[in-house]
Design a protein with these regions (language model features):
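N-terminal export signals
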Residues: 2, 7-24
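C-terminal segment of N-terminal export signals and the immediately downstream linker at the start
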Residues: 20-44
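Sequence/structural signature of beta-propeller domains
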Residues: 33, 49, 53, 57-80, ...
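Acidic/His-rich structured neighborhood in mature extracellular/periplasmic domains
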Residues: 74-212
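Active-site-adjacent substructure of cysteine-protease-like catalytic cores
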Residues: 213-220
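Charge-rich, solvent-exposed alpha-helical interaction surfaces
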Residues: 44-47, 201
Length: 220
C-alpha cells in the first residue's frame, strides 16, 4: 500500500467517533506479545492530554499524534504476532503505512473520553473495534479485515468513519482490480503459512472483496 500525505489527510478527515463497547477487549495473548513499547505510548498520550488535544477536531488531532510517531522505524508484517491465535496488537517500535494510521486513529478516539491514565488495553480495544469485522475478535485470523475497501465499508456501516471519496468530485469506480495478495503471497503471512486450512477460506473472502465497489480520484 502506497501511503502518501494526501491519503493520510483523507483518512483523518473521514474519521469519526463511534465508541467500542466496553466488552470489546479480549485477552488472547500476553501483553508483551500484543503491545510493544508501552513507554512510548504513555509519553505520547501524556503529552496529548497535557496539551488538550482531545478538544480539537479529530483530523488535526490525528495529524498531531501521527507526528509524535515520526522516527519510528517502518516495519512490515507487525500484525503477524502468533502462529495460530489472532489478537488485537499495537507496535510502537515498528509501523507500516496502515498501522501508522490505525494507531493514530485509536489514540485520537481515546482522547475523546478523558481519563487519568490511558492503558495499553484501552488502545487495544480501540484497535479491535476498527480492525475486525463488526469490531469482534475471538482469536480467528479470518476475523481481521485485510483489505482497505472492506475496512471502509465495515467501519462506515458502524459509524466509525465516513468515506468522502465520491463527495470530493471527480471520483470514478475502479474496474478490473483483483485482490489476491493474501492467497498468492501466503508465505509472507505467518498465520497462513502455519495454517494451510485458512488459505481456501481467505480465497473466498478475497472473492467477496473483489465484488465490493472501489472509488478513487485519478491524478490530473
Amino acid at each position: 500500500m502506497d501511503f502518501t500525505r494526501r491519503r493520510f489527510l483523507l483518512l483523518t478527515a473521514a474519521a469519526s467517533a463511534g465508541t467500542p463497547p466496553a466488552q470489546a477487549g479480549i485477552d488472547h495473548l500476553p501483553i508483551d506479545t500484543t503491545f510493544k513499547n508501552v513507554e512510548r505510548y504513555h509519553r505520547i498520550m501524556t503529552k496529548a492530554q497535557a496539551a488538550g488535544w482531545g478538544q480539537i477536531p479529530i483530523g488535526p488531532r490525528m495529524a498531531l499524534l501521527g507526528r509524535e510517531c515520526l522516527g519510528i522505524a517502518y516495519v512490515g508484517y507487525t500484525l503477524e504476532i502468533d502462529d495460530r491465535v489472532e489478537c488485537p496488537s499495537a507496535n510502537f517500535d515498528g509501523l507500516d503505512c496502515w498501522t501508522f494510521f490505525e494507531i493514530a486513529l485509536g489514540m485520537a478516539r481515546l482522547l475523546e473520553r478523558p481519563k487519568a491514565v490511558y492503558t495499553p488495553g484501552d488502545l487495544l480495544k480501540e484497535i479491535q473495534w476498527t480492525r475486525y469485522r463488526a469490531g469482534l475478535c475471538t482469536g480467528n485470523y479470518l476475523e481481521r479485515i485485510h483489505y482497505l475497501n472492506e475496512w471502509f465499508i465495515d467501519n462506515e456501516a458502524r459509524g466509525n468513519v465516513k468515506d468522502i471519496t465520491r463527495a470530493l468530485g471527480g471520483a470514478v469506480r475502479l474496474k478490473g482490480r483483483e485482490s489476491r495478495e493474501m492467497t498468492m503471497l501466503w508465505k509472507g503471512y505467518r498465520y497462513l503459512r502455519n495454517n494451510p486450512s485458512l488459505r481456501p477460506q481467505m480465497a473466498r473472502i478475497e472473492a467477496k472483496v473483489n465484488e465490493l465497489p472501489v472509488w478513487y480520484i485519478p491524478k490530473a
